[in-house]
């Protein structure tokens, strides 16, 4: 990450202290002395920096004697580059540049402590920047549809870039399908685990067929994914948009192992679909002799 320190010769010692801190975290640091007042040099530095620190007597303003600093501050704030300002005068006054990306301090010590606390945030921001650039260079759009495509294709490296770039794990593709459902439909267990670790909604419902992730896994007859989602607390009582309970769907797939684990974790074999038929009724209709006693035991 690239840092720009804008300061005065009289504040050189304080600037060096902060520079040492930044370098210790593997940052690249440019230092510009306002005593030079070289607008061209400062402009080039602002183009390359990811963060900026101002160490001066006051905040940059039209009233001070350094017009290039006013330009730099305006440019950085306009580009939403985090701006950290240490001023020894007017410390109790409101900070005129205050925005979400601007931070004011009354001392170098305050700044140093805050930077130390914020470094995990800076590193995460740097990781996102790198990942987004990598996607851009590869010609990959940074959007949910593209993420869903790479989940389906099992492109692990690209999926990792989307996650590192800060994609919302609860986002949906153009059809309204949550990423977790996309992963379940394509038997991507590792991706399901990753998405849940990152906070994906385990019971998110798709807008196409109205299935939850565990319903998609049952539909695909993938026991490993069903077992994982069940153990993670997936809702087993949900009824799909077309009126199918989870266990009715499971009976339709004919996967006895899936039916058994669903019942063992509380799925109700008496819950009826839109036709008024329960999982037990379908088991009897289709002569699923191994499932009938399992379901009937739940009535007792």
PLM feature spans:
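Ankyrin-repeat-protein effector appendages
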Residues: 128-146, 265, 274-275, 282-300
């Amino acid at each position: 990450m690239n840092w720009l320190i804008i300061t005065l010769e009289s504040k050189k010692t304080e600037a060096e202290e902060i520079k040492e801190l930044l370098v210790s975290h593997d940052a690249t640091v440019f230092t510009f002395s306002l005593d030079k007042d070289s607008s061209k040099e400062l402009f080039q530095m602002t183009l390359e920096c990811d963060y900026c620190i101002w160490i001066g007597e006051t905040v940059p303003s039209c009233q001070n004697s350094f017009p290039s600093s006013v330009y730099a501050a305006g440019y950085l704030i306009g580009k939403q580059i985090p701006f950290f300002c240490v001023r020894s005068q007017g410390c109790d006054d409101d900070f005129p540049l205050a925005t979400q990306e601007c931070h004011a301090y009354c001392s170098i010590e305050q700044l140093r402590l805050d930077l130390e606390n914020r470094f995990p945030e800076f590193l995460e921001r740097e990781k996102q920047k790198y990942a987004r650039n990598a996607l851009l260079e590869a010609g990959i759009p940074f959007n949910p549809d593209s993420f869903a495509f790479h989940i389906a294709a099992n492109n692990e490296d690209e999926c990792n870039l989307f996650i590192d770039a800060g994609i919302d794990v609860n986002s949906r593709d153009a059809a309204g399908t949550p990423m977790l459902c996309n992963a379940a439909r394509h038997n991507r267990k590792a991706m399901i685990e990753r998405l849940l670790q990152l906070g994906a909604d385990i019971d998110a419902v798709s807008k196409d067929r109205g299935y939850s992730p565990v319903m998609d896994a049952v539909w695909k007859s993938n026991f490993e994914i069903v077992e994982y989602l069940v153990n993670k607390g997936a809702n087993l009582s949900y009824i799909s948009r077309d009126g199918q309970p989870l266990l009715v769907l499971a009976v339709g797939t004919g996967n006895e192992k899936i039916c058994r684990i669903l019942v063992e974790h509380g799925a109700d074999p008496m819950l009826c679909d839109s036709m008024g038929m329960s999982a037990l009724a379908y088991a009897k209709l289709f002569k699923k002799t191994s499932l009938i006693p399992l379901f009937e035991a739940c009535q007792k």
